[in-house]
Amino acid sequence: MYVALAKFDVFSNISVFYPLTSRAAPAYPLPPPTTLVGALAYPYLRSKCSSEYYNGYSPAVKLLDVVYYASAGAYAYHIAKDVERIYQHVYLKKPHWRKLEMAFTVSVRGLATYLENELFVLYVSKDRKVLDYVYGITRIGRKECHVALRDIVIEKLENVISHHRVFNTIFYTPTAIAECTRAIKISMPKLDRRNFSSTTQPLLDEYFVPNGLEPMECELGPRGLLVEIDGLSIAIPRL
């Protein structure tokens, strides 16, 4: 098993919406695990010339066989909303397609910004070669959410396991593996293949998420492992 810790420069706001909500709903403070796997799947699948859909699922579902866990963190974040111009012809009936005045509309969308425009992402995978595709990640979430890899560290999992039980972390952490303070609780889609289909009932896990101002203080439970890599502490579920 291998661990990759990546640091990204974020060039625009990150917008990842809660499942089954409108565009105007608040965005997640940090990209959920399914979004992180989707970001990794994009360069991976382009190199494989893969199809857009895979037996009714997003092609990103193929990575679930090798990617065990994913998480994101930032030293501080801010949640806000913005107004954007949206192309809407594709959502209208055909008689309206020739009307230029109906081509665009406006919408409010949620977004997250990060301190110094830095976002950290952790992947745990049994396939070392898959982690090389982190170098090809150029967007996280929507196509307009551009990022660039600044630095990456890839290690064998057994080389970065820590035996500390109490730790501070900027990464969201499943409530099932640790107890955290200075945190909020948010439910996010977990890495399950059903969450990569057109489901109306997404499968969610509950996570402790930093409050946006400071790292969380956590105590590891029996179902978790603590990884310390490049000066950061991240709790992951036991294998």
Feature locations, PLM:
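N-terminal ordered "arm"
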Residues: M1-Y53
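Internal, well-folded beta-alpha domain core
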Residues: L64-L239
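Short, glycine/acidic-rich hinge or "gate" loops at secondary-structure transitions
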Residues: S51-V66
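Structural preference for beta-rich elements and adjacent junctions enriched in aromatics
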Residues: S22-P29, G56-Y57, R85-L92
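Charged/polar, solvent-exposed surface patches and flexible loops
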Residues: Y42, P59-K62, G136
